[in-house]
């Protein structure tokens, strides 16, 4: 499998996540709420600081893609598989946010 280009900016991560969710659902999805690790640290958060991006998914279109508690296993796996094509993976940190990391 050839790795696709990894996003180079915060807005690039937003667009990638939105595109993957839209591809799965076949509908337009809301723009994800994301933070850079620096923004996340400035909020006083402790986890996900070594990630590439933090995604907030509490009460929105993105919960089924990042939190298995929603029971949408296919959506969750689809997001993981599509991110992997860009050299990325995510970890669900809590039921309301996840961190996206580079594959090493």
Which residue stretches match the model-derived regions?
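Ser/Thr-rich, low-complexity intrinsically disordered terminal regions
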Residues: 32, 92-104
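Acidic, low-complexity, intrinsically disordered interaction modules
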Residues: 43-93
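An N-terminal amphipathic alpha-helical segment
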Residues: 1-64
């Amino acid at each position: 499998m050839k790795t696709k280009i990894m996003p180079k900016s915060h807005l690039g991560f937003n667009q990638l996540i939105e595109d993957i969710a839209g591809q799965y659902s076949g509908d337009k999805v809301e723009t994800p709420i994301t933070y850079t690790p620096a923004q996340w640290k400035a909020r006083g958060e402790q986890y996900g600081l070594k990630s590439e991006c933090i995604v907030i998914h509490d009460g929105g279109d993105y919960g089924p893609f990042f939190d298995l508690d929603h029971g949408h296993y296919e959506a969750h796996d689809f997001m993981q598989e599509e991110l992997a094509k860009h050299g990325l993976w995510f970890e669900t940190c809590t039921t309301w946010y996840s961190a996206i990391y580079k594959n090493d």
